[in-house]
Every structure is written in structure tokens, then in C-alpha cells.
Design a protein with these regions (language model features):
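Positively charged n-region of N-terminal signal peptides that target proteins for export
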Residues: 1-6
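Flexible coil/turn and secondary-structure edge motifs
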Residues: 16-222
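Bacterial N-terminal signal peptides
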Residues: 7-19
């Protein structure tokens, strides 16, 4: 019996450490909505919004793309006002972990960022990415205008026609309304916490797989 309990506890600890969840050092009850760039340096850039699983992973992926100037982790797609990480974790806010991507349209376009989205996660799994499950991890491609909506719809139709994936795409195509910036400790999480078990086991391998498949759109290594 003790052996079974030991195995159970070991497995539980491993599961918790290998999921996109941490006990926050300090919970911010009301994250600031990011309707405009926090820095005037970003005002000249366009924005795009994507949800494709744990935002620690997604932020790092988009940060690696040429033409992307900044990526902010946050929450979007739901109805709860000023959600925090604890609320998001319940899966009942309607929001998904989302990234806000600031990009230079003279260097990279929206369609390329959309290709990054579909090429860096599994859009056929409903409410799940890797070890993370719940509506907060669902796949969403947000659009801010009719042009972006058509680009997304056409791209999904193309992927479906070419049978790129073995199963139907379940990505939501959703109008962007408001984006809430996540707590500060989530920003640049992968970069600042390279030894975190989830980062080592899930985030970094996911980033490296993306880089290996898409060397032509990456920033030059410094």
C-alpha cells in the first residue's frame, strides 16, 4: 500500500510540475487591460492576437520571429472583466491564455504570423495543448478587422483542402475585443525561468521544434 501511495504522489508531483501552472509569488487581482501599447516605442507597430496553449510557450515562439518587436502574455476571448491567473485556471472565465504580438508590417505580415500559429501547435485538439487541458488552453485565431478575418478563413480552408492535419481543425475564429495583460511574473517567463520543469520539458522543446521547421522566418542569432 505504501508503495502505491508513493507512486501516486510521485506521479501527481510530476504532473503538477510539468503543467503550465505555478503558484504565483503575488497575485494581481486586476491585471491592466492592454488596449494601447504600454510604451510609446510600440505605437508604430501593428498587433495580432493568438491563443494556442500555454502562453509561456507561445510568447517565446513569437519572440523568435523576424519582424516581431514585442510579445505580451495575457487573457482574451471571454467575458469576465479583469480576470486574474487564478480565475483563468478554473476554466470558467471564457478567456484563453493569449499573446499580444506587436509586429513591423514592413518586415512580417499577418498571414505569416498566422502560419506561425498553425505551425507551432495542434489546432485539432479541443481545449488542450500537450499536457495542458481546459478551455483556457483552447486554440483561437483572433481578427481585428474583416481583412484579417478573411485571411484566417481562407488559410483554414487551404489547410483543410490540403489535408495538412489528420483531424478536423477546431480553432476558433474570433473577433478581438479586449486583451488583459497577465501578471508581471508571466512576462518573458520562459526566458527568465529556463530551469522551471515545465519550461525544460515542454516549452523549450516546443520552441526548438518550431525553429527547426521554420529557419527562414527567425531573427538572426546574436
Amino acid at each position: 500500500m505504501k508503495t502505491l501511495i508513493t507512486y501516486f504522489l510521485t506521479g501527481l508531483i510530476y504532473l503538477l510540475m510539468s503543467s503550465c501552472h505555478i503558484a504565483p509569488p503575488k497575485m494581481i487581482d486586476n491585471p491592466t487591460p492592454v488596449g494601447v501599447p504600454n510604451s510609446t516605442d510600440l505605437q508604430e507597430y501593428k498587433t495580432a492576437y493568438f491563443a494556442s496553449g500555454c502562453f509561456w510557450c507561445v510568447e517565446a515562439i513569437y519572440e523568435s520571429v523576424y519582424g516581431v518587436e514585442e510579445v505580451i502574455s495575457g487573457y482574451a476571448g471571454g467575458t469576465t472583466v479583469n480576470p486574474n491567473y487564478q480565475q483563468i485556471g478554473t476554466g470558467r472565465t471564457g478567456h484563453a491564455e493569449t499573446v499580444e504580438v506587436y509586429y513591423d508590417p514592413s518586415k512580417v505580415d499577418f498571414k505569416t504570423l498566422l502560419a506561425v500559429f498553425f505551425n507551432s501547435h495542434d489546432p485539432t485538439t479541443k481545449n488542450r495543448q500537450g499536457p495542458d487541458s481546459g478551455t483556457q488552453y483552447r486554440s483561437i485565431a483572433f481578427y481585428s478587422n474583416d481583412t484579417e478575418k478573411k485571411i484566417i478563413e481562407d488559410y483554414v480552408a487551404e489547410l483543410t483542402r490540403d489535408q495538412v492535419f489528420d483531424k478536423p481543425i477546431v480553432t476558433e475564429i474570433k473577433q478581438h475585443t479586449i486583451f488583459y495583460k497577465a501578471e508581471e511574473y508571466h512576462q518573458d517567463f520562459e526566458k527568465l525561468n529556463p530551469l522551471h520543469p515545465y519550461v525544460r520539458q515542454i516549452s523549450i522543446p516546443r520552441l526548438n521544434r518550431f525553429k527547426a521547421k521554420n529557419p527562414e522566418i527567425l531573427k538572426e542569432s546574436k
